[in-house]
Amino acid sequence: MDERADQVVAVATEQGFPFWGAAGLMYRGWLKAKNGEVTEGISLLHRGLMAYRATGAEIQMPTFIALLAKACDIAGGIDESLTLLDDALQIVERTGERWLAAELNRHKGQLLLLQGHFVAAEELYHKALGIAREQEAKLWELRAAASLARLRRDQGRRTEARDLLAPVYGWFTEGFDTQDLKEAKALLDELGGA
C-alpha cells in the first residue's frame, strides 16, 4: 500500500496533477502514522492537506482531515484531533458531503469519552447512530452501536447494550473476519449473547 501511495505521488508530480499528488501524500502519511512512524506521518498529512487545500478542492476533505485526526490520536494529541474533527464536521455541514458524518461524530464521541465527557459522548454516539440509520450505512451503524454499547456496558446497562448491538450485528451475513465484526461479536459474547 505504501508503494502505491508513492507511485501516486510520483505520477501526479510527473504529470502535473496536484490534486492527486496531495491525496497520495496524505495516504502515505496515514500509512506511516498507522505503522508507527507517527511524527513523519503527521508531517506528511499536514503537507498533503495544505497542498490539497491549495488546489481549491473540497471533495473528500472531511476524509483527509479524519485521517490526520486519527494520526493525532495515535500520537496522543486528543485536543488537536477534536479541533480537526470539528473542522471536518463544519465542512460536512457547509458542503453536504455527509457520507462520513456518522463516523466523524462517533470518533469525536470516543475522544470526548477519553476526556471524561460521558454525556457529550453518548449524545454523539446517538447522533452517529441516527445518521448511519438514515443513510442505511451498516458499517457506520455497527461502529456507532458498538461504541454506544460499550458505554452502556461500562454504565452497568448490559441488557440495553446487548439489545442495541445484537440486531445491528445480526444484519450482517458476511465479513465476519473483519475487525469491526470481530469486535462486535466479542462484545456481544461478553454481554451474554449474539
Go through the PLM ranges and name each one.
Residues M1-A194:
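Helix-coil-helix junctions within alpha-helical repeat/solenoid scaffolds
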